[in-house]
Amino acid sequence: MAAKLKKGDKVIVLAGKDKGKTGSISSVDPKSGKAIVDGINIAIRATRQSQTEQGGRIPKAMPIDLSNLAYVDANGKATRVGFKMEGDKKVRFAKTTGDVIDA
């Protein structure tokens, strides 16, 4: 299945403790169906000190399920993503506006 959300997309959180917040996707794991969004779903992780890194409580962005994310269109609204053929190329488009996301 083609990826509806990709790295670098601006998304809004639809459900969970960060509902309504927007951010940019920093990584996507298609196998588990999760994505890491910058500044969203932050958890405090305790890390052990090493020779190069200082230990302590470090905030870390945790993965969010892709079903809880929606692409943000040009109007700043959450939209679903569809696919269409443009010439001989398959492109993503925003269902609310019909604008092509990636040419």
Swiss-Prot record:
Keywords linked to the UniProt accession: Ribonucleoprotein, Ribosomal protein, RNA-binding, rRNA-binding
Any single GO CC term annotated in Swiss-Prot or TrEMBL for this entry: ribosome
InterPro entries cross-referenced by the UniProt entry: KOW, Rib_uL2_dom2, Ribosomal_uL24, Ribosomal_uL24_CS, Ribosomal_uL24_KOW, Translation_prot_SH3-like_sf
PROSITE patterns xref list: RIBOSOMAL_L24 (PS01108)
Family of this protein: Belongs to the universal ribosomal protein uL24 family.
NCBIfam families, alphabetized: rplX_bact
Subunit text: Part of the 50S ribosomal subunit.
Protein name as annotated: Large ribosomal subunit protein uL24
UniProt source species: Roseobacter denitrificans (strain ATCC 33942 / OCh 114) (Erythrobacter sp. (strain OCh 114))
Underlying gene: rplX
